Regions:
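Contiguous, function-dense segments enriched for cysteine-driven chemistry
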Residues: 32, 65, 69, 82-85
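Recognition helix of helix-turn-helix/homeodomain-like DNA-binding domains
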Residues: 55-73
Length: 94
């Protein structure tokens, strides 16, 4: 099994996906978080499934979360994609 297949399998687990996104967010580089969220979306059925579940346009998701990780999703799109992936954003004191 290659790394991408292993990661995709792990990202189906809510706790692992939450930890993965938390670590990506701590990098403070938006492209890292955007790429990580794309990995989670792909592992959970892909952009088409998340678009349907989140009532988002597929085109807007493909633009917001390109494979390169260089998308620039709006907060609305990012929160909707997280919810449609079964996750939510939370905050805690540093």
């Amino acid at each position: 099994m290659n790394h991408d297949d292993w990661l995709s399998g792990q990202l189906k687990d809510d706790a692992f996906a939450a930890h993965y996104l938390t670590q990506a967010a701590q990098d403070l580089e938006p492209a890292v978080f955007t790429a990580a969220l794309r990995h989670v979306i792909d592992a959970r059925g892909g952009l088409a499934k998340v678009a349907d579940a989140g009532k988002l346009s597929r085109q807007s998701l493909y633009k917001a979360f390109p494979v390169t990780g260089k998308g620039n999703p709006t907060a609305k799109t990012m929160f909707a994609a997280l919810r449609a992936s079964g996750l939510q954003l939370t905050f805690k004191a540093a």
